[in-house]
């Protein structure tokens, strides 16, 4: 299954989750597209609930199914902690996500584009792989030639707050993942146990 590239507003309504992080998609119509009002949502089966939760998490990070599943498999090999939380931490450590968390992009999709286009450095070296896994303490910065890219500057200016697990210097356009996030700091609307149950049946 390829990565979804359609309208994020319609997909957000289908999932009941803001994919842009603004919440605007759900402000007027918080029911799925095609429904005639919010009271016509059909009741989901156990499998349907698990699938829906998996899709919410997958679309939140903008990943294709194969890439998402492979990351879950990697999480199963981590000995400490719970599987669901370990999986979410791996998602958070993706370079495109860290760029988004730092406020260098307004959405994860935009952050992925910035990485792909070579605008982002890790410890002073250009990395154009969105799935690159960031370690705490590594410095994420904007390439000198890209420091005046309007979209990057606009994103930084529009960012009102950042998670406690990152630090950022707006003048230098650089920051870092200072530590791994705690569970209550990421995606509180996600029930990762349902995602684990879904893949336990599939793998």
From Swiss-Prot:
Entry's Gene Ontology molecular function annotations: rRNA binding; structural constituent of ribosome
Domain S4 RNA-binding intervals: 93-156
Pfam family, one: S4
GO cellular component, one term: small ribosomal subunit
Parts of the chain that traverse the membrane: none
Disulfide bridge map: none
Keyword set, alphabetical order: Ribonucleoprotein, Ribosomal protein, RNA-binding, rRNA-binding
InterPro entries from the UniProt entry: Ribosomal_uS4, Ribosomal_uS4_bac-type, Ribosomal_uS4_CS, Ribosomal_uS4_N, S4_RNA-bd, S4_RNA-bd_sf
GO biological process terms, semicolon-separated: ribosomal small subunit biogenesis; translation
Gene3D superfamilies xrefs: Ribosomal Protein S4 Delta 41, Chain A, domain 1, RNA-binding S4 domain
Family membership: Belongs to the universal ribosomal protein uS4 family.
Role according to the record: One of the primary rRNA binding proteins, it binds directly to 16S rRNA where it nucleates assembly of the body of the 30S subunit. With S5 and S12 plays an important role in translational accuracy.
Record text on subunit structure and interactions: Part of the 30S ribosomal subunit. Contacts protein S5. The interaction surface between S4 and S5 is involved in control of translational fidelity.
Protein name, UniProt field: Small ribosomal subunit protein uS4
